[in-house]
């Protein structure tokens, strides 16, 4: 039914149009709506939350809504000044139909047939597509602009962010190459230790033994995996690294559940 009177928290993951249509129904009796779509992310009165970074923002929610950031934004945020990122986003980012299309195309090519293109702009199998979502201002895609705006909102800062988002022929788990510039030079060992201690992050970084994160081994796991940590040769204040995360887990479901767990721990779900 449409009565959320006895519901404390509702996880909404049915797309932006559904979120906009049902938000008032869900929240009018005090239920907290944790929304996985992009519908409310940039509303000034809706907190955008990654629990490990800005959990307390979830406590102030005038509309009764908390937005879950875009999956690639969640993977990247950390207290920094300037970021360049190139994303390598799996077919699963386009949903079940995206994964099925990649699988169908690979099978068709294996049979010597012409692959069918429906969900993506071009054939994804054995290809890279440097476009995710439609093109917007300054020839950036909407996905790239989401990373820019959402990261700045989560960090409460004028952080400089530039992204290039690429769809890759991987079934599940997004990867990112990230270049970070800080205000002062950082010791690499200190950065490594910070990653090691950070909640929700697993450091997989041993180049001598070829240890680094790969989507093949990270699908269906919760943490963000970080490796290839090194100094940026182009900047004395720069660090560069590689990270991989299953965007269906930390990028959506897990982050939403962590927000709810934080609200419970803070006693923030009791209805007045």
Enumerate the language-model features and the residues they cover:
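Proline-rich low-complexity regions
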Residues: 47, 51, 69, 108-110, ...
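Active-site-lining helix/loop region of Rossmann-like oxidoreductase modules
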Residues: 5, 59, 80-197
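Catalytic cores of large soluble enzymes that bind and process phosphate-bearing ligands
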Residues: 14, 71, 120, 139, ...
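C-terminal active-site/capping subdomain that shapes the small-molecule cofactor and substrate pocket
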Residues: 159-272
